[in-house]
Amino acid sequence: LAERDRINKRFQNPKFKRFVSVTQLMIFSNNMEYDDTDVQAIQGAFYASPSYLEPQFNYFREEEVLNWTALLKPLSEDTELHVLKDNNLEVIRSNPEFITNKEPNRPTNLICTSLLSRERLAFVLRYALAYVHETDGLQKHVMRYPQLFASKAIERKLNDGIKKGIIWHTQGSGKTALAYYNVRFLTDYFQQRQIVPKFYFIVDRIDLLTQAHREFTSRGLTVHTIDSRDAFSRDIKATQVIHNHSGKPEITVVNIQKFKDDPDVVSTKDYDVTIQRVYFLDEVHRSYNPKGSFLANLDQSDRNAVKIGLTGTPLLGDDYNSRTLFGDYIHKYYYNASIADGYTLRLIREEIATNYKIALQQALAEAEVLQGDVDRKLVYAHPAFVEPMLDYIVTDFEKSRGALNDASIGGMVICDSAEQARQLFELFNAKYAKSPVSTESAANEPDFPLLKQAAETSGFYRVKRKQNNQVTSAALILHDVGCKEERKDWVEDFKVGKLDFLFVYNSCSPASMPNA
């Protein structure tokens, strides 16, 4: 932690800017094993790309069996003694801890061997670094270790003559970024074989096309988008690999939502076979019909194409099996691993407070009496039930902000129905929107968590902190509320912290709730 704080202060100092700019890769280690229960990266060996703000520490878990005999050069006693003398540490030479820490399987030695061996370091410097245009400026990103090993796995499959398969990486693990890195990597891979590649990223929803376009352009790729059958048919038959005149790397993002089951959208005739087409197929867990779907016809049209399916939840049933349609798994990265690496937050189901549970039960009974024997969705959307539920949500959320000392946390309320979402939003605007509590009531709040520091026990600070944690803004996301651009803007405002709450209705199953 001390070293991390030190590097953060240095990199935020304008005088260190030149050193930050020339730094490509950093490794931090306290030579301890990872503690997967830690919320923050506190112990272990981590790698990061430089940042003018705070470097993002990444875990590294070696997946390949390394030949230490070939990679590591034996250390002579003279060299060891010279280093110890130079640091005035000869006394530790016979120390058991020093002897143990020389072993190649210690955390620091492991990450150094994994990342700094000649071949790996060359790969990282050439393909694993990217400048990303974020909302807060230009950031330098480094490839996550599952993306690195997935890229190497793709290379092995291609070397073995296998041209299709599935990458099973959990939701939120950076599958679009993986596709970006492999545009660069596979371009060089095929050019070494005198082959010109042409890259496609195929999605089946317009919002996914927009998201992919944003992800690719922010990383510097030129993006060509296709959203119609005729445009895709023309593009796939064209001999032109890129559409820009500067020679920059390019990818074509295709939304097949309107024509994915059209058997004639891709035709074998007039097909240029001199181009190596590489398809990244997003969300291949969806139920594509293997007999009449777009993807089946795509397979028939270009047998030589490379098809890489991306999914976080593959289909394993008898009717639709992802492996049957798209090939065997190229690489896997599961939900639990992503949680341990800090890329995915752990889902926690908590019981609601007893007093509110009783209040909600009473409100539900009252709503049932008022509504009579009707659809339960109408009961759950009745103000008699919705209002106490909203009170509990807001109160519990504001307490969580205080307990976590983070007023930037946002909340998404996934409602039982569109009617319930509308009612919640209407009541929120009536009771909470832009209505900060008075100074006196906030200072006297009995269950408001107090900080331990003496300097922070004044009534003014408590009032200020209480007001910062207040929920005062929200948006309603429904298909018939606002236009597409407005809904998109509301979601973006929520992501950057301009909105506290989103009230949404998403008819998803419990299993797909994390994707909502």
PLM region spans:
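Conserved C-terminal RecA-like helicase domain
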Residues: 247-250, 377-504
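Interdomain helical connector at the RecA1-RecA2 junction of SF1/SF2 helicase-like NTPases
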Residues: 101, 320-408, 424-426, 430
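Short basic/glycine-enriched coil/helix segment immediately N-terminal to the Walker B
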Residues: 159-163, 191-192, 245-248, 263-278, ...
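Conserved helicase ATPase motor motifs in RecA-like P-loop NTPase domains
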Residues: 170-171, 283-287, 301-318, 342
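SF2 helicase catalytic motif II
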Residues: 270-306
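Inter-Walker segment of RecA-like/P-loop motor cores
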Residues: 217-264
